[in-house]
Amino acid sequence: SAGWDALRAQRHANLVDLGLVDKGIKLSPRDEQVPAWEKEPNQAWQQHRMEVYTAMMSHVDQSITNVIDVLKEKKQLDNTYIFFLSDNGASPEGHLNNTVERLGSPWNSAVIPKNTPQGKKVTAGDWVNTSIGAPDSYGSYGIKWANLSNTPFRNHKTWMHEGGIAAPFIVMGPKIAENSLSHQPVHIID
């Protein structure tokens, strides 16, 4: 993997090339809690975390494609608006507030299932070298990759900076020009 530094620069350049980000908007500095990629001691594990996240996003993308295909099949696509959005910027929540580093233990939360529907114990937390992505795991990609996801903005969910509050809002439907871009602000309170 090229790591988060190279990928942030590449993503910023791509966003500018696509016209999604004005060329005058500079890439924000790397988050102060995120080391330079070459100083990351657990590169292989960090790469695995991003691979799992990428697979999840690919699954989301395929699921949206499936919805569109069904709407086409039922001849309802021309009568449907599809909204895709998030309620905040990327989440830095790995082990909340660096729980593992501070306390030496993983997440301890009521929202994390204790077992899979099949009864297998769920491994919670983002322990270094613990595999995530399987049905019996509950993990995330943490602040280091959230910093990449929020390119070009600073900070992330829980912050009032653009990285915390700017989020994608994609709409598909009748009378909406394909590949069009609007700069109209949209606000939703969750």
Q: Where are the model-predicted features located?
A:
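Active-site His/acidic residue clusters
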Residues: S1-Q10, S28-V52, N88-L103, I176-A177
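Aromatic-residue-lined binding/catalytic grooves and analogous aromatic/hydrophobic interfacial grooves
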Residues: S58-D61, I68-L71, L85, T99-R102, ...
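A surface-exposed, glycine/aromatic-enriched loop/edge motif typical of exported proteins
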Residues: G3, L7-N14, E101-A124
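Generic, well-ordered alpha-helical scaffold segments in large soluble proteins
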Residues: N14, L18, M56-H59, S63-K74, ...
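Extended, charge-rich helix/loop segments that form flexible
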Residues: D17-E38, Q118-P135
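Substrate-binding rim/cap in mid-to-C-terminal beta-strand-loop elements of soluble/periplasmic
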Residues: I68-D69, S109-D190
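Extracytoplasmic/secreted proteins, especially bacterial periplasmic and envelope-associated proteins
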Residues: A6, Q10, N14, H48, ...
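Metal-dependent active-site segment of extracytoplasmic phospho-/sulfohydrolases and closely related
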Residues: K26-S28, H59-L96, W127-S131
